[in-house]
């Protein structure tokens, strides 16, 4: 049937998003200028923030870059903020953009090594409880130094690969479409496949939570960590040590949850790898090992050496994080023989959409600063006692981060805390403690939903999720024990351990206060 030009434009607008979603975004774009000019810029600013959080929460309906970007462009156009203020925010956070562009791309060229490691873990550890713990620990360690998205991408690659191998064997190679189970006519084979799906689901969730447990600990673990570290004037070691009073107890209890849910088969965990599947995968791995050439073996060794360089460069703060990532790209591609421009370009595909979205975040942050939107909330929190301030910052961050994106939330709150310090409302010592509360608040409770953790959202929207029947609801349910324990232990750490442990670390000479002058933090 022929459609009118108007219908064609509406169909093209935001692509395959639901009609109600398209109407909501159009409604926002119509209402915002009216409220800004005829009601109140402050109210319009808050409407923009809520609308932007809505686009983040609806990320499965439409990637937030397009609707959020339209709202941000309009905000600049009508005068909610200026292009100069947006450019200033981007300049202040250039390190974060470099982290996303170069570090994620750099790790892309180390995927062979990471795939090798996770494959060996899966096939060589027979105890499901120990295997789950190993996946959680490996993801945590890698996420402390690499980007969580990349770590999850690698685990997804391993899982999809294994699923494909077994699915093709069990369906007698009759159909290469791994989404189609019609070739599996044996009831026993169906049950084995369902058990394998449950096994992969639990492993993916353990790995996903592992990225959060490790990612909160270091300044490169999550993008917002780098923003917080820069604002507070911390280097890699400072950040790690300052977070320990909260992150270490959370890490220990997170691993305990991993063991308990597997041992007692709670919340959908506990499924074993079927023996039939193990045999198929082991045979395949043996064939792959036999075919591996000397060239490929040397690539793995080179990538391992580059991995050591990456850890040392970050730990010793030898260069800015993005530049370390760039060095990884150059070293890995040079010594692994990747010199084709097209092959290089693939490495940047994963990170650039999120980098563009983060730039839109900064435009919304510019509106928040220009319109002083969070000033009343911050004033309310800062009226409380210093210890209560820490808990309130942690809880406010946690609540918002579980429904919105934690990079956005962390950026907004650290800017407000920094502003309070610069205006003499809080001391330097209190600002440093608030920075810890903000970082842990944005990272820990955000495992509650896929909206909060970019790695979880990446998993949910991946090709693997439908194969292993991992839906939004199931992901929230399986994350629940982790959410409750990590949030509560984190809060107790902020409330009871953070202040005394920080004082002890300062007296012991492990940490010292940075010099902050002219809005710039200079670490010792």
Swiss-Prot record:
Keyword field contains Membrane: yes
Keywords of this entry: Antiport, Cell inner membrane, Cell membrane, Ion transport, Membrane, Sodium, Sodium transport, Transmembrane, Transmembrane helix, Transport
Catalyzed reactions: 2 Na(+)(in) + 3 H(+)(out) = 2 Na(+)(out) + 3 H(+)(in)
GO cellular component term, pick one: plasma membrane
Pfam family, one: NhaB
Chief localization: membrane
Stretches that traverse the bilayer: 13-33, 98-118, 140-160, 239-259, 304-324, 325-345, 358-378, 448-468, 479-499
Subcellular location(s) of the protein: Cell inner membrane
GO molecular function, a single term: sodium:proton antiporter activity
Recorded superkingdom: Bacteria
InterPro entries: Na+/H+_antiporter_NhaB
Family assignment from sequence similarity: Belongs to the NhaB Na(+)/H(+) (TC 2.A.34) antiporter family.
Known role: Na(+)/H(+) antiporter that extrudes sodium in exchange for external protons.
Protein name: Na(+)/H(+) antiporter NhaB
Native source species: Yersinia pestis
Gene: nhaB
């Amino acid at each position: 049937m022929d459609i009118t030009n108007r219908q064609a434009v509406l169909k093209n607008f935001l692509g395959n998003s639901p009609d109600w979603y398209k109407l909501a975004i159009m409604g926002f774009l119509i209402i915002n200028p009216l409220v800004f000019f005829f009601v109140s810029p402050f109210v319009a600013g808050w409407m923009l923030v809520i609308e932007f959080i809505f686009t983040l929460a609806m990320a499965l309906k439409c990637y937030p870059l397009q609707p959020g970007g339209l709202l941000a462009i309009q905000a600049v156009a009508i005068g909610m903020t200026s292009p100069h203020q947006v450019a200033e925010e981007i300049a202040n956070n250039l390190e974060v953009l470099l982290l996303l562009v170069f570090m994620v791309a750099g790790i892309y060229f180390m995927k062979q090594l990471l795939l090798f490691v996770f494959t060996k873990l899966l096939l060589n550890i027979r105890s499901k409880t120990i295997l789950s713990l190993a996946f959680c620990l490996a993801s945590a360690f890698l996420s402390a130094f690499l980007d969580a998205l990349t770590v999850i991408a690698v685990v997804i690659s391993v899982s999809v690969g294994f699923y494909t191998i077994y699915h093709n064997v069990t369906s007698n190679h009759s159909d290469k479409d791994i989404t189609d189970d019609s070739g599996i006519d044996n009831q026993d084979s169906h049950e084995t496949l369902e058990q394998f799906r449950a096994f992969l689901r639990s492993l993916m969730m353990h790995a996903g939570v592992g990225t959060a447990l490790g990612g909160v600990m270091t300044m490169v673990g999550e993008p917002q960590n780098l923003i917080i570290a820069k604002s507070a004037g911390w280097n890699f070691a400072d950040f790690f040590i300052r977070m320990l009073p909260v992150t270490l107890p959370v890490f220990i209890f997170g691993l305990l949850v991993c063991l308990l849910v597997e041992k007692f088969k709670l919340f959908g965990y506990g499924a074993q790898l079927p023996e039939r599947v193990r045999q198929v995968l082991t045979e395949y791995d043996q064939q792959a090992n036999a075919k591996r050439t000397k060239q490929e073996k040397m690539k793995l060794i080179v990538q391992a050496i580059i991995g050591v360089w990456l850890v040392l460069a970050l730990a010793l703060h030898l260069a800015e994080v993005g530049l370390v990532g760039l060095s990884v790209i150059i070293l890995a591609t040079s010594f692994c023989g990747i010199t084709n421009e097209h092959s290089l370009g693939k490495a940047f595909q994963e990170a650039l959409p999120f980098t563009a979205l983060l730039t839109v975040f900064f435009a919304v942050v510019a509106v928040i600063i220009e319109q002083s939107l969070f000033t009343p909330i911050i004033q309310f929190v800062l009226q409380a006692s210093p210890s209560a301030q820490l808990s309130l910052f942690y809880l406010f961050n946690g609540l918002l981060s579980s429904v919105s994106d934690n990079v956005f939330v962390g950026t907004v709150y650290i800017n407000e805390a920094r502003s309070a310090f610069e205006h003499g409302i809080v001391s330097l010592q209190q600002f440093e403690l608030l920075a810890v509360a903000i970082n842990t608040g944005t990272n820990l409770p955000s495992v509650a939903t896929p909206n909060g953790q970019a790695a979880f959202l990446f998993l949910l929207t991946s090709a693997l999720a439908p194969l292993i029947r991992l839906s939004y609801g199931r992901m929230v349910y399986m994350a629940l024990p982790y959410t409750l324990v990590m949030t509560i232990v984190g809060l107790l750490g902020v409330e009871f351990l953070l202040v005394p442990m920080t004082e002890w670390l300062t007296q012991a000479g492990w940490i010292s206060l940075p010099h902050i002058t002219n809005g710039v933090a200079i670490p010792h």
